[in-house]
Amino acid sequence: MASVRSHEDIELMTYSEVVEVSGYVGNFKAKIRKKARYIDESKCTGCDECSKVCPVELDSEFNEGLSKRKAIYIPFPQAVPNKATVDKRGYPPCRVTCPAGVNAQGYIALISEGKFQEALEVVRRTMPFAGVCGRVCTHRCESECERGQVDEPMSIRTLKRFIADYELKAGREKAIPIEQTKDSKVAIVGSGPAGLACAYDLVSRGYPVTVFEALPMAGGLLRYGIPEYRLPNEVLDAEIDYVRELGVEIKTDTPVTALKELSNQGYQAIFLGTGAWVSQKMGIPGEDSEGVIHALDFLKKVNSGAEVNLGNRVVVTGGGNAAVDSARVALRLGAKEVTIIYRRSRVEMPAAASEVDEAEHEGVNIHILANPVKVLSHDGRLTGIECIRMELGEPDASGRRRPVPIEGSEFTMEIDNLILAIGQAVDRESLPKELAYTQWGTLSVDPVTGETNIPGVFAGGDVVEGPADVITAVAAGKEAAESIDRYLSGIDLREGRPKQLDRVKEVSKEGVVKKTRAAMPMLDLDKRLGSFAEVELGLDEDTAIEEAKRCLNCAACSECLECLKVCEANAIDHEMEEEIIEVDVGSIIVATGFQQFDPSVIYQYGYGRYDNVVTGLQFERLSSASGPTEGEIFLADGRKPESIAILHCVGSRDENYHKYCSRVCCMYALKFSHLLGEKLPDASIYQLYIDMRCAGSGYEEFYERLQEEGVNFIRGRAGEITNIAESPEEEGKLVVIVEDTLVRRKRRIPVDMAILSCALEPCADADQVARIFSLSRKADGFFLEKHPKLDPVATMSDGVFVVGCCQSPKDIPDTVAQASAAAARALAMISKGTVEIEAATAVIDEEYCAGCKICIGLCPYKAISFDEEKEVSTINEAICKGCGVCVATCPSGAITGKHFTTEQIMAEIEGVLV
């Protein structure tokens, strides 16, 4: 490889694949996809410092999965070129599902390494709310987590909270202000999650940003709508302070009612993130009675520190988080009996299931399939409610079954307070009058850009979407920041949006051991009531690290960007894209090799189920001095094996899989026996073979030598490998069951390790390769040569040669000989300068050609094209092989074979018959 690399006439295009070939012998055009390595090869020094800090470990392909490598890696020390590669397989499901695109795999990977502050930096590249979202996010990411298909989803939200809490406990350092590089001022109206997220993104881009908040403190519904036992003020304050420290100015007690005010102050773009603060009414009699409270008003008063007096009996109507929060707050304020009434079933409650469970645990009663129809009062004061029972009917527009009242099922409840939590709406009175609204009362904006009917004015969050979760509001703020940046920079607001993340297509779960998801420690029940102390206590360091290690690293590279910090050559480029390169070549040599037969499909051999059943390639790496064990042979538990069985013809010479002989298995199985004899001289070695095929120079002599060395040869195909013992000597062993055809009896051979000599089979993409290079395939799937004896390296496509195991299984000497032959053929064509073509090519009579183009699609050699000017098909004689497909299918009879005209053929037939 080193000689190839240093040869001045050889250009190595690694990490590349041919995607299209056109033209003909001597004049091929090849399109090559050069995959993104994410490394500038001209800068990379191969120092491998990047892999040392990479937190992601993956199975090493070079060591056949027996060891690990990093997501940024050099495959092996002698790799050519000796440059790193970043393994990116798409975006992980958690990141794709997150509305804000938070890189969960990135911070989880760093947590697994104990790099907690670095993990927090990963979250802050996207948003400033690790502590907030670590507590109140609806964690849609967890519902898509691939780990859930193994045991339970990753505790993504909890891990995010952990790194935020870790910084708070360690003492957060003040953030360094971001330099303002832009002159255009931006105003943000509303300091909720949407407004702060928008401000955060814009200040990160260098804009001077001011946030206007009507209430005394920043935070919006995060502060005034979520109780402290779920979101402590110190956590929210810390993250708002972080945004301030970066350079965002926040003005509280400053309502904005006219956009012109902001324009007059020099603001060139405005974002409205004022939320949905108005509680919806039920529209039932007596709803305005004293003692009826709206949930948002109730929570706002409590969170503001105002005195709130409740009676002993409180009913909350609704099934969302606001309803559950109100019920749990009522208990903490001293209510003796708190009941949630919800008109649908328990499973259809939109509140987080964990919050509902905790509410019940604290003593909240949940009355499902019921709905208040009337508020009972005396002298204007609430005394009770009248409800009706419901049943579920046909699905409504939301897809849920519609609740239908049951006639005659009315009942009453005596209560002291009723808290309404059935929905929220936008407060239009607090917004500028010139804005346009939708039929649902929310602000009307462009669905892609977030721009309102007024140019330069954008909106997002609940004021646009209606009541939604925090992370949706954060995402809206981020999208608005992108739009504002484009607007102020004079760039098209819509181009390239919305951006679609390419989700990783397949995540291997092979060999993943089930582990219990980390449980969240909870505050004792007796410490909750009468107190607003946080209920969820958070994970400790050890638990967080162990939980993070459960991650499957779906996308390989987590894009944590730790590698950038240590690369002194600045060779890493995570934004690199693949290239399509076109090259002109005269000939093509196809040497795509083979793939190893997957022995796990032969279930009875136990590969993938028993740790000490390995393939031949895996043992090759185990026995190599550069392998994962430095050449020492160990079992999975660290012991050295005392007995080893080597099974021949696994997947080959088998009617159920491949009928052909793989040719190399016998010899490498014998080589393994010799290596084992050297490394483990006292071990018992068994060779289980059908026929020993040692056809090569010195091969038979080597076979005889191993017989003399004491290797046990048993003629017969193994029927099963099991760990079920039938005698004391089989305890703790693998038992190979085989019929010894020489002595005609079944044998049970207890061994410590079994090595499977697997078949060589065509690569999985062989069909695609065949289409690209116009190759034919044999019945066994390997590429078909032009003639097995007279032309074993050429194909039916002139100038295209096949060599090595892609043509048929063969050993290294035969592969080298075939490769040399193909090289000689290619060089001969170059030196000669001309090629001989088939004499019997097809010819098109342009007068008869109808231009139907049927022949073009049928030609297996792509020899026919269409002349747009003449409107007829034409044949390239240099490519045509005279196969006759086009002649037989031409509906107008315009195509004939040269030297095989219709007149000639008819005359020949007539001569035979007459």
Where are these regions (language model features)?
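Non-heme iron-sulfur electron-transfer modules
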Residues: 1, 13-43, 55-93, 102-128, ...
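Beta1-alpha1 glycine-rich phosphate/pyrophosphate-binding loop at the start
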Residues: 1-6, 70-71, 93, 99-112, ...
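A Rossmann-like FAD-binding core segment of flavoenzymes
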Residues: 4-36, 40, 232-280, 293-310, ...
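Phosphate-coordination loops involved in phosphoryl transfer and adenosine-cofactor binding
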Residues: 15, 41, 182-185, 253, ...
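Residue-level detector of alpha-helix initiation sites
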Residues: 49, 128, 192-193, 320-322, ...
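FAD-site-proximal beta/loop scaffold in flavoenzymes
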Residues: 60-82, 290-312, 395-467, 509, ...
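Long hydrophobic segments that form regular secondary structure
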Residues: 311-344, 406-417, 423-425, 440-441, ...
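A conserved FAD-binding loop/helix module that cradles the flavin
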Residues: 326, 463-488, 589, 656-667, ...
